[in-house]
From Swiss-Prot:
GO cellular component entries: mitochondrial outer membrane; mitochondrion
Name of protein: Carnitine O-palmitoyltransferase 1, liver isoform
Positions of post-translational 3'-nitrotyrosine modification: 282, 589
Record-listed Phosphoserine modification sites: 741, 747
Result for mutant: residue 477 to A: Reduces activity by 98%
Keyword Membrane: yes
Catalytic activity field: (R)-carnitine + hexadecanoyl-CoA = O-hexadecanoyl-(R)-carnitine + CoA; succinyl-CoA + L-lysyl-[protein] = N(6)-succinyl-L-lysyl-[protein] + CoA + H(+)
Any Pfam family the entry gives: Carn_acyltransf
Tissue occurrence: Liver and kidney.
Tagged with keyword rRNA processing: no
Length: 773
């Protein structure tokens, strides 16, 4: 085969006339280009390291400071108050340096020291400024003079064009709340969920903890917070994610869907070519650290960017006791799964990224390949879908050497994983509800063996060219994948585009090596483990009751007219819907972020409050008036927003209690209070998918190009998982998951209650859905 010959730089044979050496010039050329590419990336990393290392100054400012110091010395002005003279005296005790040389060297050294001191002062000043969070608690739309001055100072110290990681060393550390404050907030959060007798018992446990064991655990936690960059994130990653022994599929991984109503081409290979190229463009921008750091409050307050580091070239490696995350700096290939076969596809040729048409060519060759799967190959990925321990043992036994290790390395060290799915998914006008549900379920779990659930992202291209992503959760949270996904969809349609016949723009290239099949030698014993994993994973997947639907009766535009937060509005609608569905309240989880702090991830907002319960009960009481309901609604919204702000600013409940629990385990002490708190089930788990890059295209002019967001599986066996995305002014998309095996839950029933709850609340304001126009 041609590609096999191209892969060999030289060959030799021994003949009677001597050694016959044959060089492959094409292979040598590709080796040289690969080396140049590698050195170019190293240089870019080195340059970016310098730029980020001197932030908020810039490297050129060093020259300005040094020239200024030396110029003042020539003008007989000593800017150092005698320090330059001291440096000069200590430079050369042998007397071999001329006085002019000593003066210049002394001036450069003093100027450099002054420059570093100014940088450290600016950085510390910025960190102090970013530690202020009073702006979050100000009344919406009203900004005090002191806040405006504070914002101006932050902007001055933030530089003109910060890179992705520029703010990392200037971000404050996540503060450790006082134990008594956390315990008090916890008791307030469970008050509406407990009977008086149970609440009094929990209050006694909590108060005993706050006085006795709590302060001891807190001392160790504070010690960690002084030493570690973030006192939560490493333990959260290890104990919540990596030590989990259950399946990643459904339980941990989540999915992202694309545009609902638009499919720019119906050619599967073409859609794959464009979108893979768009992903690679994003990766290149990320590698160069040219992504703009996300900033709040009018692009002023930066969020932590640490989670972007492991977006690509990352895989979760199974272990018997705990998993690990493997991340490599660079990967020049992807692995593509189609019809039970695994293919390795190189992403570079002639020292450049493959163009969209060239990637389409590669994908089409895979689709046209008639070869059959090797024994055990077709359903191999089921190992990543089921329990971790069998996969870890199987990996160690059958994939630690030989061709199996080489092929597994290719998968785990790929930039990302691609599935060319044989099914057709997406919105169908003749059956909108079932088609969207099927689309979501396919992205969440597929057929349990056609997604590599260990990879940071599995990119799925369906036969009818609809696309989606399945993402592993341990390395980062959903907003990072969402940021990538927004870029990919916009670049695919509005930047790259397609030809009139639906192909990628550009020309094919016959010189590109073809995709190569990964080779496996999977014995019968291993195939039995694969079959067992597939069986257990299929039971889990078939139990998922997933309902995904668009809500277009009104959106953010109309909610704003109610003078309330869209998120608070939806959260109260969820509380009302849950009560309609279950006839009771439950502990509710809403994911918030703590990325205002260095290496921050998430915090929990306990959305079921006394205020929200009072509102829901008023809505269910036919005797209550609209005025009473509206008043209670506004009180509940204000409470929710206050809790959300507390969570964002490091004053949440659950991460603090979680870390105290980890400390108690290290100290081998038992806490009945912490044990009970951490065993409470979240029967309603919710999350909003943020829209982060509204500048990519105009939603109002392109209303059909809206994303459906994404979703996740239910957290509790008898509960619901609800995700939602607010797009533009008039569109919200919901994803509801539960389990068929629970007699108490029904995702479609909950969806109907949620639609009605949204309409019931908007009616309180005397607004109709036509008010949005």
């Amino acid at each position: 085969m041609a590609e096999a010959h191209q892969a060999v730089a030289f060959q030799f044979t021994v003949t009677p006339d001597g050694i016959d050496l044959r060089l492959s010039h094409e292979a040598l050329k590709q080796i040289c280009l690969s080396g140049l590419h590698s050195w170019k990336k190293k240089f870019i990393r080195f340059k970016n390291g310098i730029i980020t290392g001197v932030f908020p100054a810039n490297p050129s400012s060093w020259l300005i400071v040094v020239v200024g110091v030396i110029s003042s010395m020539h003008a007989k002005v000593d800017p150092s108050l005698g320090m330059i003279a001291k440096i000069s005296r200590t430079l050369d005790t042998t007397g071999r340096m001329s006085s002019q040389t000593k003066n210049i060297v002394s001036g450069v050294l003093f100027g450099t020291g002054l420059w570093v001191a100014v940088i450290m002062t600016m950085r510390y000043s910025l960190k102090v400024l970013l530690s202020y969070h009073g702006w979050m608690f100000a009344e919406h739309g009203k900004m005090s003079r002191s806040t405006k001055i504070w914002m101006a100072m932050v902007k001055v110290l933030s530089g003109r064009k910060p890179m992705l990681y520029s703010f990392q060393t200037s971000l404050p550390r996540l503060p450790v709340p006082a134990v008594k404050d956390t315990v008090s907030r916890y008791l307030e959060s469970v008050r509406p969920l407990m009977k008086e007798e149970d609440f009094q018992r929990m209050t006694a446990l909590a108060q005993d903890f706050a006085v006795n064991l709590g302060p001891k655990l807190q001392w160790y936690l504070k010690l960690k917070s002084w030493w570690a960059t973030n006192y939560v994130s490493d333990w959260w990653e290890e104990y919540i994610y990596l030590r989990g022994r259950g399946p990643l599929m459904v339980n941990s991984n989540y999915y992202a869907m694309e545009m609902l109503y638009i499919t720019p081409t119906h050619i599967q290979a073409a859609r794959a070519g464009n979108t893979i190229h768009a992903i690679l463009l994003y990766r290149r921008t990320l590698d160069r650290e040219e992504l703009k750091p996300i900033r709040l409050l009018g692009s002023t307050i930066p969020l932590c960017s640490a989670q972007w580091e492991r977006l690509f070239n990352t895989s979760r490696i199974p272990g018997e006791e705990t998993d690990t995350i493997q991340h490599i700096k660079d990967s020049r290939h992807i692995v593509v799964y189609h019809r039970g076969r695994y293919f390795k596809v190189w992403l570079y040729h002639d020292g450049r990224l493959l163009r969209p048409r060239e990637l389409e060519q590669q994908m089409q060759q895979i689709l046209d390949d008639p070869s059959e799967p090797q024994p055990g190959e077709a359903k191999l990925a089921a190992l990543t879908a089921a329990d971790r321990v069998p996969w870890a043992k199987c990996r160690q036994t059958y994939f630690a050497r030989g061709k199996n290790k080489q092929s597994l390395d290719a998968v785990e060290k790929a930039a990302f994983f691609v599935t060319l799915d044989e099914s057709e998914q997406g919105y169908r006008e003749e059956d909108p509800e079932a088609s969207i549900d099927s689309y979501a379920k396919s992205l969440l779990h597929g057929r349990c063996f056609d997604r590599w659930f260990d990879k940071s992202i599995t990119f799925v291209v369906f036969k009818n060219s609809k696309i989606g992503i399945n993402a592993e959760h341990s390395w980062a949270d959903a907003p990072v994948v969402g940021h990538l996904w927004e870029y990919v969809m916009a670049t695919d349609v509005f930047q790259l585009g397609y030809s009139e016949d639906g192909h990628c723009k550009g020309d094919t290239n016959p010189n590109i090596p073809k995709p190569t099949r990964l080779q496996w030698d999977i014995p019968g014993e291993c195939q039995e483990v694969i079959d067992a994993s597939l069986s257990s994973a299929s039971l889990l997947a078939n139990d998922v009751d997933l309902h995904s639907f668009p809500f277009d009766s009104f959106g953010k535009g109309l909610i704003k007219k109610c003078r309330t937060s869209p998120d608070a509005f939806i959260q109260l609608a969820l509380q009302l819907a849950h009560y309609k569905d279950m006839g009771k309240f439950c502990l509710t989880y809403e994911a918030s972020m703590t990325r205002l702090f260095r290496e921050g991830r998430t915090e929990t907002v306990r959305s079921c409050t006394m205020e929200s319960c009072n509102f829901v009960q008023a809505m269910m009481d036919p005797k209550s008036t609209a005025e009473q309901r509206l008043k209670l609604f506004k009180i509940a919204c204000e409470k929710h927003q206050h809790l959300y702000r507390l969570a964002m600013t490091g004053a949440g409940i659950d991460r603090h209690l979680f870390c105290l629990y980890v400390v108690s385990k290290y100290l081998a002490v038992d806490s009945p209070f912490l044990k009970e708190v951490l065993s409470e089930p979240w029967r309603l788990s919710t999350s909003q998918t943020p829209q982060q890059q509204v500048e990519l295209f105009d939603f109002e002019k392109n209303p059909d190009y809206v994303s459906c967001g994404g979703g996740f599986g239910p957290v509790a066996d008898d509960g619901y998982g609800v995700s939602y995305i607010i797009v533009g002014e008039n569109f919200i998309h919901f994803h509801i998951s539960s389990k068929f095996s629970s007699p108490e839950t029904d995702s479609h029933r909950f969806g109907k209650h949620l639609r009605q709850a949204m309409m019931d609340i908007i009616t309180l304001f005397g607004l109709t859905i036509n008010s949005k126009k």
